[in-house]
């Protein structure tokens, strides 16, 4: 068995690390995790003992935050704007569990989730803080002209395109 181990046990999208057979052996692959997992599955299927029954179970990091599609999918939805769903302005009233989750487009998408690049000259620690800003309702905008509803719509488009491109890479690798 191989299990993603880095990034809080969820694995990373690029250069994932795997724990092998429950031991401390860690291997790192230098590609997108979705493609790595597909290749590992195909390799295992090709080399298994065909005279014996088998079960192959595999799972992907995708589509967990921060939704990083493989490079071939970066612009797959570039020329398309997705309509906002009916629940776009939902306030989760009367649904306590939903209201306590950090899943609001307006209030819970930080700079990292939006794939922004930290300003040059920051220390690694300050760069990580800069990228994390935007959680818990902290206000930020990628430029001086985006705010209010326009900013919320921009965040939604960025999020939904990254999310669906990430899911597309899973679909194509199953």
Where are these regions (language model features)?
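Short, well-ordered beta-strand core segments
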Residues: 1-4
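Active-site-proximal cap/lid insertion segments
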Residues: 6-28, 47-51, 59-173
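Outer-membrane beta-barrel proteins
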Residues: 28-34
């Amino acid at each position: 068995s191989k299990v993603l181990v880095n990034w809080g046990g969820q694995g990373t999208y690029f250069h994932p690390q795997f724990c092998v057979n429950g031991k401390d052996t860690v291997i790192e692959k230098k590609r997108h995790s979705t493609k790595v997992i597909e290749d590992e599955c195909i390799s295992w299927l090709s080399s298994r003992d065909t005279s014996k029954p088998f079960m192959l179970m595999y799972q992907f990091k995708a589509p967990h935050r921060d939704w990083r599609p493989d490079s071939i999918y970066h612009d797959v939805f570039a020329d398309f704007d997705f309509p906002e769903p009916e629940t776009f302005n939902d306030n989760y009233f009367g649904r306590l569990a939903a209201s306590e989750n950090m899943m609001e487009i307006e209030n819970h998408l930080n700079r990292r989730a939006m794939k922004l690049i930290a300003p040059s000259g920051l220390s690694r620690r300050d760069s990580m803080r800069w990228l994390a800003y935007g959680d818990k309702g902290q206000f930020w905008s990628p430029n001086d002209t985006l705010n209010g509803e326009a900013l919320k719509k921009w965040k939604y488009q960025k999020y939904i395109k990254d999310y669906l491109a990430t899911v597309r890479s899973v679909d194509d690798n199953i």
